[in-house]
Regions:
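Pyridoxal 5′-phosphate
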Residues: 1-243
Length: 243
């Protein structure tokens, strides 16, 4: 979840779906953090954003089952998607090319390739799976450290979702005595700390928690416990100013 950071049991979700249901998984918060076996999770499609794993922005990746590639039609028909055309009609490409209309984001694709090559260097065996495992282990250290620090502020800060160890390193929170998200965001910006405040494209979930929005702090491979110390020092200072 891009709000709670929790990791869901996709196989369990899949088992509760009707056979004809198209099962699409948004892996933007999971693919950058740990290895996913697309065939194992039983999804029809998996999407993720490349910039969340250190590539450039404006690049999305769509993984489809072969059968779904045959069944689905493209949203946009443009250069590269057409196999043949006449005055009266056209024939689409039969493979994944029918979904790749126009000039692709070449720079973005190259940046993702280099990001993946860098991730390989994180493991002694120089493999992608080993690099992803290194990211996961580092992130779990940050998760434990972050939860421990938030526990000390429980009377002033509310974390959203179940705070379990099975999660990625993003944390959405609200201050119990401050609902002005712009003020919170501006305060952290003044400390050169980047957080996001708002609905995070998940308004129904926020309504479930009876909240108009939350502030979200995220950590990744390039963050350290020293970075987290700076965040919590600033958060504590903000809480003091409210009193």
């Amino acid at each position: 979840s891009n709000v709670t950071g929790n990791i869901y049991d996709l196989k369990k979700i899949k088992s509760r779906l009707r056979k004809e249901t198209f099962f699409l998984v948004d892996g933007s918060q999971s693919v950058p953090n740990f290895s996913i076996d697309f065939q194992d999770i039983g999804a029809d499609a998996l999407v993720f954003t490349a910039h969340k794993m250190m590539a450039q922005t404006w690049l999305w990746v769509l993984v489809l089952k072969n059968q779904r590639i045959k069944e689905l039609s493209p949203l946009i028909v443009w250069g590269g998607t057409i196999k043949d055309a006449t005055i009266s009609g056209f024939d689409l490409q039969k493979n994944n090319q029918k979904f790749e209309a126009g000039t692709p984001n070449i720079i973005g694709a190259v940046s993702l390739l280099h990001a993946l090559e860098f991730i390989k260097t994180l493991s002694p065996e120089q493999t992608l799976s080993g690099g992803m495992q290194a990211i996961w282990q580092h992130e779990q250290e940050l998760v434990r450290y972050t939860l421990k620090n938030f526990e000390q502020l429980w009377n002033a800060v509310q974390l959203i979702g179940s705070q379990t160890a099975r999660r990625v390193a993003l944390f959405s929170f609200v201050l119990r005595d401050e609902q002005n998200f712009n003020r919170i965001w501006e305060f952290f910006a003044e400390q050169n700390i980047c957080i996001r405040c708002g609905g995070h494209c998940a308004y129904p979930l926020h309504k479930h928690y009876h909240l108009g929005g939350t502030c979200r702090m995220s950590a990744y491979l390039y963050n350290t416990t020293e970075d987290l110390d700076r965040f919590f020092t600033s958060l504590s200072e903000l809480i003091k100013r409210q009193r």
